[in-house]
Amino acid sequence: MNAPLGGIWLWLPLLLTWLTPEVSSSWWYMRATGGSSRVMCDNVPGLVSRQRQLCHRHPDVMRAISLGVSEWTAECQHQFRQHRWNCNTLDRDHSLFGRVLLRSSRESAFVYAISSAGVVFAITRACSQGELKSCSCDPKKKGTAKDSKGTFDWGGCSDNIDYGIKFARAFVDAKERKGKDARALMNLHNNRAGRKAVKRFLKQECKCHGVSGSCTLRTCWLAMADFRKTGAYLWRKYNGAIQVVMNQDGTGFTVANKRFKKPTKNDLVYFENSPDYCIRDREAGSLGTAGRVCNLTSRGMDSCEVMCCGRGYDTSRVTRMTKCECKFHWCCAVRCQDCLEALDVHTCKAPKNADWATPT
């Protein structure tokens, strides 16, 4: 009897810290606060001392981060637009996403990664646009260099992504570094995966100089790709996310299923399976799919069968204004008529009990 009891006591601290509810990244709420930087720094709930310190010290960076929140939440919603959970946000909730991210799920892994990536992208872009006092274009990209096409001169303004990554790591990871629990380690891993994703799509752009564009001389610079590429990449990582458990000394992960490979620094990791998101459930933070538009002809996640969780759907006839009878006129315009188009819209039926689900 002693050995099993000893094993239980060994794992009990890890289990208790695993279940901690303090997992929301309160800096996400910076989108909703607005106002001056001082007001923002003092009124965003849940910032740790290091985050408030950086907030007061770098108000211009905070403005860039707060503007970036809308960008990465929009990207999250784009990637999940055909899924039961569609990355919906709650404007009056300081965690931005409500209770749904209290679960250490795939969705949590994606949100932490895309938000960390969004901070890198927003700061780096602000650096290149001359909006920040603490950084500018990448100072290392000077002089002459060589690539597969020959020599070129560094010119223009190379995106200073190393500064963006460094500041994002200091600000975003500050709260997680104060904790030693399993969820903090999960968040740190996914935060890093998000930062690395932005740098993955840094590309070299060049301009040719010479007679008739002969490219005798080239001037090149490094530029971030559109954030959609980062979002699509992290979406693929979400679909291939690896379920993990804590190792015995509580310092890292091991795969939950031994048939799968160990996660790399680029992979997303999670602990818990996701709910089905079919019905409104206050405890799970699920808004359900009642009223969601579904695709009658699709066989994917947006199909009426999958989106509506087998509850069926309602169909309504709606009209919308579209462009029609378009003709090309010389030179150089396309002129169209405005036409009314009737189409059927299918929306998921509500469950028989439309109230908030009561957990049993």
Curated annotation (Swiss-Prot):
Gene Ontology MF terms in the entry: cytokine activity; frizzled binding
Keywords tagged on the record: Developmental protein, Disulfide bond, Extracellular matrix, Glycoprotein, Lipoprotein, Secreted, Signal, Wnt signaling pathway
Lipid anchor positions (O-palmitoleoyl serine): S212
Main localisation: secreted
One Pfam family hit: wnt
GO CC field: cytoplasm; extracellular space
Cell location: Secreted, Extracellular space, Extracellular matrix; Secreted
Post-translational modification remark: Palmitoleoylation is required for efficient binding to frizzled receptors. Depalmitoleoylation leads to Wnt signaling pathway inhibition.
Signal peptide coordinates: 1-25
SMART domains: WNT1
Disulfide pattern: C76-C87, C127-C135, C137-C157, C206-C220, C208-C215, C278-C309, C294-C304, C308-C348, C324-C339, C326-C336, C331-C332
Glycosylated residues (UniProt): N295
Keyword Ribosomal protein: no
Family statement drawn from the similarity comment of this UniProt entry: Belongs to the Wnt family.
Role this protein plays: Ligand for members of the frizzled family of seven transmembrane receptors. Functions in the canonical Wnt signaling pathway that results in activation of transcription factors of the TCF/LEF family. Functions as a upstream regulator of FGF10 expression. Plays an important role in embryonic lung development. May contribute to embryonic brain development by regulating the proliferation of dopaminergic precursors and neurons.
Protein name: Protein Wnt-2
Gene from which the chain derives: WNT2
